[in-house]
Amino acid sequence: SLVVLDTRQSHLLACQERHRAGLAVGLELELHALRALEVVDVEEQALLPKGRGKFPDKPFVVLVVGVNGAGKTTTVGKLAKNYADAGNKVLVAACDTFRAGAVAQLDVWADRAGVDIVRAQQGADPASVAYDAVKASLNREIDVLLVDTAGRLQNKTNLMEELKKIQRSIGKQAPQAPHETLLVLDATNGQNALSQAKEFDEV
């Protein structure tokens, strides 16, 4: 499951301040804070449009981003299976050409989901892989293209610029794409998750 933080941070901060001061929080404030945390079961409530033929544009391109070790490749694998099980033609793009074993890991997930994969040698230009994946998707009449990317720290300018290059490569053949960008976060990040979200949102 995922824990989604609502925008009502003020309630959570107020609870923290009263706890630090040794004061009672109060039932109403606690309820507000609890409502600000929404637990979403990914298996029961799809994050994205589900079912074949329900996408405004095809391929429906989903770019998956995040820092190192957050679980991007695993997320791509699970989404691929979800979409394939719903009857969609799915293709995954292995644009993490930096991490050793990243392509092999995505290969395993693609095989489990029964979907095809576009890959390149380690060290290849990830933007080129993304371009080839969109081209292949158009030729094969793919419904959903899932783009896995290398982990990158949000404060590393050159890596964030690389992400922009990937987006531009995707948009050359599919002007409205990527249609969705998913930021995968580690649930233990705390307030750093907000910093990551802001930085990735600016890309």
Predicted regions and their residues:
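Generic structural "secondary-structure junction" signal
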Residues: 49-50, 100, 155, 161
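Primarily NTPase-proximal linker/entry elements flanking Walker-type ATP/GTP-binding cores
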Residues: 1, 20, 35-95, 102-123, ...
